[in-house]
Amino acid sequence: MVIMKAGSSRCAFSLGFLVGSCSLYVFLRQVWFEESFSWQSNGRSSPSPPISHEQNSSNLTWRVEGSALINLKHPNQPGEDGHIADELFKKVRILCWVMTGPSNLQSKAQHVKNTWSRHCNVVLFMSSEEDRSFPTVGLGTGEGRDQLYWKTIRAFHYALKNHGHEADWFLKADDDTFVVVDNLRWILSNYTPEQPIYFGKRFKPYTKQGYMSGGAGYVLSKEALRRFVEGFSTKVCTHTTPVEDLAMGQCLEKMGVLAGDSRDSLHRETFHPFIPEHHLTGKFSKTFWYWNYCYYPIVEGPQCCSDLAVSFHYVDPVLMYTLEYYTYHLRPFGYQHRYQPPVPAVLSLLSQTVKTTTETQRSEEGAKEKPALTNSVNPRAEEVQTTETSYKITNAAQERNTTHRSAG
């Protein structure tokens, strides 16, 4: 009997010691964060001198400023008509920061640098260590999954403090995420950066309004980012879990930031947490956790993904270049898109100018009796511009915009 009591006491002591140790660890990590984070806020440790050099000086498209890549103009292929995308590039400014690490710079981050990041206005590669040759921002954290939220907190603070004036929206993506930035711009053009809102692949557990998957990437308005940073200065938000995307969602919910609906008018998702083939071919087992996490009903097969898809996750370097080719180069001859979304309201004047110019060109071509097969888009396609689908998209975007304005 005495032996049993002694054993029970030892178990109770061990359990108490374990709980106390875990609590102390969390407390000390929080204290460490608050003290060590002062490198951002009070300038105790000044950043490295800025590096500035230009690429393609004969036809300048981007330059390096400090640890940032600045894309000076929207990239287009020779002979390509990208005037609408070019205008949105100027009016919907997106800062893209990419979560990476020293061991991933050449194996992963370099391929992001070569592909989709060229469509962002500002690009930052966030790492635990500074690398001025790549370049990366050194966040002064460790590496590993338990460091993801630390890196995210510091990265967003850094982005707002150092580049807040250069962007309206702030996208977080991993170094194995592929993003179609131009499609993201179209979604964001229906909102304003003054609205406290963010978008991504919406999950539902553990928060009232849901939260956005970290792997698929998520984008914050400038006001949402301001509130996120404020949440830490007021201690409304703290680092209590290493689960980055969930902790992010919980903080933003506390700060009154709305979790936006980024689906298209046909309720197809735009942000995707897996590679395209997993969504398109229905490879998800019914016991897979994904079924219990998705905020909206899962659709498998060809209708899984919007024609204006924004992102895919777990993309290896080969697939990164493949998706870049499929997105910006591959075209089937003789076909129009299933629907052509309406030009955003912010570009309505440009749209009218383009329409007038197109009609003038069409008249001139008719007068010259050019052959039917030309290198331009089929003129008749523009005469059938407003389809039932595009009408629904316009209404859906306007309704969401009105709703979010009221909520903001």
UniProtKB/Swiss-Prot annotation:
Residues bound to UDP: M99, E143, G144, R145, K151, D174, H313, Y314
Pathway participation: Protein modification; protein glycosylation
InterPro entries: C1GALT1/C1GALT1_chp1, Fringe-like_glycosylTrfase
GO molecular function, one term: glycoprotein-N-acetylgalactosamine 3-beta-galactosyltransferase activity
Topological domains annotated Cytoplasmic: 1-12
Binding residues for Mn(2+): D174, D176, H313
Protein topology in the membrane: Single-pass type II membrane protein
Pfam families listed in its UniProt record: Fringe (PF02434)
Binding, a glycoprotein: W289
Any single GO BP term: kidney development
Disulfide bonds: C96-C120, C237-C251, C304-C305
Main location: membrane
Polar residues bias (residue ranges): 373-400
Location(s), subcellular: Membrane
Residue spans of biased composition, Basic and acidic residues class: 361-371
Listed GO CC annotations: membrane
UniProtKB keywords: Disulfide bond, Glycoprotein, Glycosyltransferase, Manganese, Membrane, Metal-binding, Nucleotide-binding, Signal-anchor, Transferase, Transmembrane, Transmembrane helix
Region (Disordered): 356-408
Sugar-bearing residue positions: N56, N59, N401
Segments crossing the lipid bilayer: 13-32
Reactions catalysed: an N-acetyl-alpha-D-galactosaminyl derivative + UDP-alpha-D-galactose = a beta-D-galactosyl-(1->3)-N-acetyl-alpha-D-galactosaminyl derivative + UDP + H(+)
Chain ranges on the Lumenal side, renumbered to this chain: 33-408
Reported cofactor(s): Mn(2+)
Family: Belongs to the glycosyltransferase 31 family. Beta3-Gal-T subfamily.
Descriptive protein name: Glycoprotein-N-acetylgalactosamine 3-beta-galactosyltransferase 1-A
Organism placement in taxonomy: Eukaryota, Metazoa, Chordata, Craniata, Vertebrata
